[in-house]
């Protein structure tokens, strides 16, 4: 018999009074069910004995179907039980609404519908547990109008002072982007009441949750300053408070602030947890703070924090982006490798280090392990092909993505292909590829082609592509700078001046070059012609020494990189103070002989700096790693891992 067909029909002659069949005797067994199939067997016993007419029995079955963990949950089954219940009390309504509100967005919409059905039931009134669930559904689905109506109903039924209801109202307004409404509720229910010292721990913890919700809301809107102001006002903070600040700064691109908040957290009495590590590792990766990343890895192991696919992938990404691919491989090999996220992280690590062959090998092993590639895995694989100049392999994998794995290429996949073709000198094919794209190319696609034009010295196509970009993103400096570079390389200074004038008229500024270097856990940041560092005098002396030694080694500055019509000597002086050269000089005076130097650059490393650092690695017998916007450059003994292809 299928229990869902006759959910409440009595059958057989099982005595209702039998201890073996009485609902209360089966409740512990319900809690021990591992699957819905297990539950259906108990459900069948209830039906045969006629006990499903018992409100308590039906509610217990409903509770398991609707609100147990997601692995056991079956909302369709729960909904059938609910619809056929002879009597529904507030608990039953709350249970089914909660179940749907905790599911995906489509099912959360059903929770809202169920709430309105409940309100039309003249025999049932909502209680303090009803509103939080339906408000969660409104927050998840962005149904602000329904949320406001439910807010009014909460007040009507006397729950305006209930901290549980209020916290979910604030969360709903925050998630829907209505920070003004959230702020009014927050200040009325928290800030004004906070004048009195809280002695009730439960209420105090509830208020901390509200503070965290507000901070998260400001971070979601990109208002990091408002979030920080609230955070600083908190008299007590939970680990979630710290995690919210760290993840918020990271998501908004304020990586130094994220790491700084983490350092503050370390000094206090709240220990970082799993979420802390997952939140701060991306910031550490972007800054290249290897020492802090290694500390986190060790902390996780010593604290018994399980390194699962998500945390493991974050560690792989951190080691890869800090230039230590060997440690990334070590982490990867210790993971179960059952999830595509882990494989994708490792493929990306190989890609940014220019190890295209290893990336392809990793991709093939992933297939052999029975893990289906994701669209992200293909982006990383195509990036590896691009950095390795593997045109045929790139074409094959782009085609295989659709024909074998049935994945629809995203704009990022097309961008990888344009980059691959352009870097390989196939500019006409790259342009044709763009024009035949089934989706409209964005500025990133055209920038990839423009970069290839600059690399290949094709000024004619470069002008055409730059004009497209200037129309598409008129206030972006990229097209102006790239075209200026091409004109400067030809000595066409009148056109360079024209570009500079157009930028000035439109108040467009070039992104300043910036290089970071981590010395003993402290980040040092340098910009072009930077003399603000406390050791500026020593750095300048080292730059002079480097210049002298490189000349003796045969170095000649590549002055076509300078976008100014200057005398040759003046151009050399400009190149002398590029941020990556200053960072390299600082690394040489701040570390012992033979120790590796690691630098992170926010832009693409220029040709002259690339040539210089190759020689510096040979003259000073140092391994120097530079991570620019595109990839890693491992300089050693006068050569670079990119083989001068970047």
Swiss-Prot record:
Keywords: Repeat. Residues 552-646 are annotated as: Type DYW motif. Residues 521-551 are annotated as: Type E(+) motif. GO terms for molecular function: mRNA binding; zinc ion binding. One of its GO terms (cellular component) is chloroplast. Residues 9-24 have a biased composition (Low complexity). It holds the Pfam family PPR_2. Belongs to the PPR family. PCMP-H subfamily. One of its GO terms (biological process) is RNA modification. Residues 445-520 are annotated as: Type E motif. The gene is PCMP-H38. Residues 1-24 are annotated as: Disordered. This is Pentatricopeptide repeat-containing protein At5g48910. PPR repeats lie at residues 54-88, 89-126, 127-161, 162-197, 207-237, 238-272, 273-307, 308-338, 339-373, 374-409, 410-440.
């Amino acid at each position: 018999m299928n229990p869902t067909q006759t959910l409440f029909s009595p059958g057989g002659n099982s005595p209702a009074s039998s201890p073996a069949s009485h609902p209360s005797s089966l409740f512990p067994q319900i809690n021990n069910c591992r699957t819905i199939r297990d539950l259906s067997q108990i459900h069948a016993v209830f039906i045969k004995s006629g006990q499903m007419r018992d409100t308590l029995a039906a509610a217990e079955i409903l509770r398991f179907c609707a609100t147990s963990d997601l692995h056991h949950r079956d909302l369709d089954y729960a909904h059938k039980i609910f619809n056929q219940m002879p009597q529904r009390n507030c608990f039953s309504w709350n249970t089914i609404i909660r179940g749907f509100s905790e599911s995906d967005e489509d099912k959360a919409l059903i929770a809202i519908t169920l709430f309105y059905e409940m309100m039309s039931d003249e025999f049932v009134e909502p209680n303090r547990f009803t509103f939080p669930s339906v408000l969660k559904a409104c927050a998840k689905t962005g149904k602000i109008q329904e949320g406001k109506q439910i807010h009014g109903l909460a007040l009507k039924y006397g729950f305006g002072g209930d901290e549980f209801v209020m916290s979910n109202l604030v969360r709903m307004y925050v998630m829907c982007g209505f920070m003004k409404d959230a702020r009014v509720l927050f200040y009325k229910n928290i800030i004004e009441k906070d004048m009195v010292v809280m002695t009730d721990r439960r209420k105090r913890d509830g208020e901390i949750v509200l503070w965290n919700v507000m901070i998260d809301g400001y971070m979601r809107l990109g208002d990091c300053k408002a979030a920080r102001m609230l955070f600083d006002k908190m008299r007590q903070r939970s680990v979630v408070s710290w995690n919210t600040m760290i993840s918020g700064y990271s998501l908004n691109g304020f990586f130094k602030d994220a790491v700084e908040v983490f350092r503050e957290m370390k000094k206090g009495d709240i220990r970082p947890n799993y979420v802390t590590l997952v939140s701060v590792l991306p910031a550490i990766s972007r800054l290249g703070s290897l020492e802090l990343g290694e500390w986190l890895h060790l902390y996780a192991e010593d604290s018994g924090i399980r390194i699962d696919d998500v945390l493991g992938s974050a560690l792989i990404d951190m080691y890869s982006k800090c230039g230590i691919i060997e440690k990334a491989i070590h982490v990867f090999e210790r993971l179960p490798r059952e999830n595509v996220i882990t494989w994708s992280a490792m493929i990306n690590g190989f890609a940014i280090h220019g190890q295209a062959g290893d990336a392809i090998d990793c991709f093939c092993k992933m297939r052999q392990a029975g893990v289906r590639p994701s669209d992200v895995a293909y982006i990383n694989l195509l990036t590896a092909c691009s950095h390795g100049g593997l045109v045929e392999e790139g074409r094959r994998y782009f085609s295989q993505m659709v024909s074998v794995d049935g994945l629809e290429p995203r704009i990022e996949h097309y961008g990888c292909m344009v980059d691959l073709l352009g870097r390989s000198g196939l500019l006409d094919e790259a342009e044709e590829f763009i024009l035949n794209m089934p989706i409209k190319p964005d500025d990133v696609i055209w920038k990839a082609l423009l970069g290839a034009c600059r690399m290949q010295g094709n000024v004619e196509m470069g002008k055409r592509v730059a004009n497209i970009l200037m129309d598409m993103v008129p206030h972006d400096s990229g097209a102006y700078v790239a075209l200026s570079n091409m004109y400067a390389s030809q000595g066409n200074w009148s056109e360079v001046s024209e570009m500079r004038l157009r930028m000035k008229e439109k108040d467009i500024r070039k992104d300043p070059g910036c290089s970071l270097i981590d010395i003993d856990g402290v980040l040092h940041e340098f910009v072009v012609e930077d003399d603000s560092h406390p050791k500026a005098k020593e750095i300048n002396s080292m730059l002079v020494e480097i210049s002298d030694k490189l000349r003796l080694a045969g170095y000649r500055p590549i002055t076509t990189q300078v976008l100014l019509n200057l005398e040759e000597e003046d151009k050399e002086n400009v190149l002398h103070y590029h941020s990556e050269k200053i960072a390299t000089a600082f690394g040489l005076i701040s570390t012992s002989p033979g120790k590796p130097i690691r630098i992170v650059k926010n832009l693409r490393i220029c040709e002259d700096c690339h040539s210089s650092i190759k020689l510096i690695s040979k003259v000073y017998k140092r391994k120097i790693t530079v991570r620019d916007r595109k990839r890693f450059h491992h300089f050693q003994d006068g050569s670079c891992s990119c083989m001068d292809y970047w």
